[in-house]
Amino acid sequence: MIIYDKPFKTYEQQIELLRTRNLNISNQEFAIHALDTISYYDLINRYQKHFIPDGEHFIEGTTIEQLYSLSMFDRSIQAFILKYSMFIENIFKTKLAYTLSRDFGVDMSVYLAKSKYKESYQNPNNVLTFDAVQLECFKTRNDDKIANNPTLYYREHHNHIPPWILLKNLSFSNSINLFKLLKNAQRDDVVNELLPNEPDRIIPLNDKTNFIICALEAIRVFRNAAAHNLDFTALRTDETRKIPSSTLSKCLPGKILIKKEKKKIEKNEKVYLKGVYGVMLSMMVLLKTDYLKKQFIVDFLSVFNGIDEGDREIRPFLFQCYANIADMPVDTRNRFLIYLEQT
């Protein structure tokens, strides 16, 4: 007979276990509510880096109310990331669809013709082929379980499906893959539309292309983690897909959002850029206009507002915990406030 190492426990048993691990639980009813709505795993395991440094016992004085508040705070940041990831996805797909339509036309058999693309693209861990991506595009068009409005509507009521319609239903991942496989002329056009040079900022095309690919991939991965309730705070970009810090710094000049020492990006800053902070700064770059960047910052700062005075007072403490777990600068809020004042 198998003795399972993670057997089922009732909420009452979970509470007793947490008490033996030094978690302060004074309100049994609230504790059951917290475990019933958020779950033991999401409430405890997700934040143990900060609250359970030895892996066994909570820091003295830690309460279940603090964990619950931190979880809600975490979800506010995830909702913020979700909102802007969808915006970035739309910006990217709009640029991609425009280029495909202008250069190749609106007939799917033409703008998805193999001759228009590179045969393959070398990802860090595998080879991406055009045949595989083309197949995903056809699945989106043909399969009733995948095809939805507007693609399904166009399939049934029009004589073609233009790029701007297909891309509405093509996944973010497959849209990025299609972009990777574009020949240089079209890919360069999309890159320059997403990240145009400015009089005081000239970035080599290869560097811009690498940044766009890494930034879009990171935004997609963090968006998916938030959408599917995965361990968002533990997510980091690996070495093969990390957002290029030097290019990001050129796009956000000054020493406000990315700290430098003697014109070099500090070591801690590079750690921050592997997590959600790097994704946030990449989003700002892709938003392009000062208005959208300011709106982005205002929306982020709103997570500190709280529902009442007591909730607002605890927000700085919650963010300090969150920053420690997610590897964000503890002064993120101040950095954005200063950026707002100076732009």
What are these regions (language model features)?
Residues 2-342:
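Long, contiguous internal "core" modules enriched in hydrophobic/ aromatic residues
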